[in-house]
Amino acid sequence: GPSFCKANGKPCSYHADCCNCCLSGICAPSTNWILPGCSTSSFFKI
């Protein structure tokens, strides 16, 4: 399931092998269209 970006240490990116992040810190694989983690308008790097 989703995890905290700081916890899994993955960079925030649009790449499928990276982590998608939002202001809440929740993230999920960018290929997961059901639970994408957050809107693309809220993406940022940690």
UniProtKB/Swiss-Prot annotation:
One of its GO terms (molecular function) is toxin activity. It comes from the Eukaryota. InterPro entries: Conotoxin-I_CS, Toxin_19. Its main location: secreted. Disulfide bonds join C5-C19, C12-C22, C18-C27, C21-C38. The keyword Disulfide bond applies. One of its GO terms (cellular component) is extracellular region. Expressed by the venom duct. The modification 4-hydroxyproline is found at P2, P11, P29. Keywords: D-amino acid, Disulfide bond, Hydroxylation, Ion channel impairing toxin, Neurotoxin, Secreted, Toxin, Voltage-gated sodium channel impairing toxin. It is found in: Secreted. Belongs to the conotoxin I1 superfamily. The cysteine framework is XI (C-C-CC-CC-C-C). Iota-conotoxins bind to voltage-gated sodium channels (Nav) and act as agonists by shifting the voltage-dependence of activation to more hyperpolarized levels. Produces general excitatory symptoms. This is Iota-conotoxin-like R11.17.
